[in-house]
Amino acid sequence: MELHQVPGAPVYYLIGLSGVPGAENEGHTSNAGFVVTDAGVVVFDALGTPALGYRMLQRIREVTDQPIERIIVSHYHADHIYGLQAFEEHAGDPPVWAQQLALGYVGGSSASQGEDAERRLAQRREALFPWVDERTHIVAPDHTFEKELRFEVGGVDFLVRHLGPSHAPGDSIMLVEDHGVLFSGDVIYQGRVPFLDSPQTDSARWLEGLDYLTSLEPAPRFIIPGHGDASSNPEQAVRATRDYIRYVREAMRKAVADFMTFDEAYAQTDWSDYEHLPAFDASNRGNAYRIFLELEAAAFGGE
């Protein structure tokens, strides 16, 4: 697990591997990072297993012995939150912040969503054993926010903003304002096909969130996405994710308007701009089908 530093800033990050979480990558498929200040460390996301969270904590301790002041969670998906357990057990249980919809996922307001979390945990206990096992549990947020959270630690200003529902209902980004660094969570997938194949995904709102990122002034100088490599060209990273979503939506919109079946629509769509990207084989067809259903429901009033 290699630790990277943003040039000229006390901002550090870890990059996950391509592919779906499994034994070959030990669940390390997402990105996470942290910011060192004079008054403590601010962590963004915690990786996908307690073991990975502990290794992340070790990397933090290689840089600083400052306490973990707080953890910001981009969204409550397994590959970003199971590492919270390591911080709970080995870093003094620092406060965890997330957008308020996270409470539903952990069972705080919706039994069905709490059951979803338990089903995912059961699946990961099988797919990622022994890195996720019977001792693994979901750490709930200690604090939540609705739309926006601003705070300061050690003279560094932070902005956390909810951009969901997009990839997930609670999708949130964190801007380290003093250093022009953006942690985008899964609103941005860099250099690979995004994951849209979820009933929670709202592709129209996702595009609105990407438009918000392009409107930031001053524009960020560095972006750390939820998946894929970090980039010193945030505009390009935003554009790549946005162009893919727009392309899939337009292709499926035309298909719905022409009363085509999904199989017909998928077969006649030119995917050549994307078929070389990591995760294309694993995700693209499911992405297109999810958007097809979304637009079909919007057009014909389905559920």
Model-derived regions: residue spans:
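Acidic/histidine-rich helix-loop elements
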Residues: 13-30, 108-109, 114-115, 193-203
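Active-site HxH/HxHxD metal-binding segment of metal-dependent hydrolases
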Residues: 53, 58-143, 150, 169-171
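Core dinuclear metal-dependent hydrolase active-site scaffold
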Residues: 144-176
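C-terminal regulatory/interaction regions
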Residues: 257-303
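Divalent-metal (often Zn2+) His-rich catalytic cores of metallo-beta-lactamase-fold enzymes
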Residues: 181, 203-260, 264
